[in-house]
A protein has these predicted regions:
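Long, compositionally biased intrinsically disordered regulatory segments in eukaryotic proteins
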Residues: 1-89
Length: 89
């Protein structure tokens, strides 16, 4: 899996995890507000525009605005599955 696909997978899993916490409508609505990603109706990330690290951080930030530390704790295990995906430059 190439790097962009890994970032899309990580972000899609984050959205899925937030769907459980916030409900699918709210989780997808918040994700669609992130300008550097495109989200399918099913909540999957279909495109990353620009830097994937910035896109990932923007997605995380949009959920942190709502739920704070709970979000950070809930997505931690996702990053264990994708050791090559970085959150910062």
């Amino acid at each position: 899996m190439d790097q962009t696909e890994q970032y899309k997978s990580v972000m899609s899993e984050i959205i899925a995890k937030q769907s459980v916490i916030l409900g699918p409508d709210m989780a997808v609505m918040r994700a669609k507000k992130v300008s550097n990603i495109r989200i399918g109706d099913d909540g999957a990330v279909v495109e990353i525009i620009g830097d994937p690290i910035e896109a990932l951080n923007s997605l995380i930030d949009t959920y942190v605005e709502l739920s704070g530390q709970i979000v950070k704790n809930s997505i931690g295990p996702i990053f264990i599955k994708y050791p090559e995906v970085k959150q910062t430059k």
